[in-house]
């Protein structure tokens, strides 16, 4: 089954890519960590499988992964969120729930306008205890940005915390600067709505007062370590 969103995904008049000095410095920190992780990725080998971000639920990968029915069935993936320009073959669309939001991997693309939709979609799949693959062409920019937005929204984490978590799971992620800037501004929105705290080291007491049912990434990881 295919759900196709054809809304034009480009920067609108209200979306500015002009960075403040603070935004520029914060992006430099993320890019430095990303470069270190990318070096390890090339030095120690690559994997032919999608990256498991959260246990038994969320996978991040590329177009090749999304086109491999045997691989998808092995990982019990039922849902595919495709955010690249290319569609999937009919064989995949007939056997999986495919949601296609085509968008170019360009800094001026307004990817943030889709965060509410993709976050709700992924959270719905999580609640059904089913598995989803989020992918773009290479699994490093568009799809990584979508996953980062989900981690920020539903695990109450700052961009820095979510980014450091994700590069441990998939070191080759490389969102373009425009996407990183939009994630920073999305973080500001979540801070204003008290869904995340402004300080990476701040107590999570205020967050725990919220209605959001999913733990922070640290709580999530700790719980699963105890279950093993």
Where do the language-model regions lie?
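Short, acidic/polar
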Residues: 65-72, 199
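Beta-strand cores of modular interaction/reader domains in eukaryotic scaffold and signaling proteins
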Residues: 52-53, 59-61, 76-84, 97-102, ...
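Glycine-rich nucleophile elbow surrounding the catalytic serine of serine-hydrolase chemistry
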Residues: 140-145
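PTP/DSP superfamily signal
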Residues: 1-47, 119-131, 146-228
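Short, polar loop motifs at secondary-structure junctions
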Residues: 44-47, 64-66, 82-89
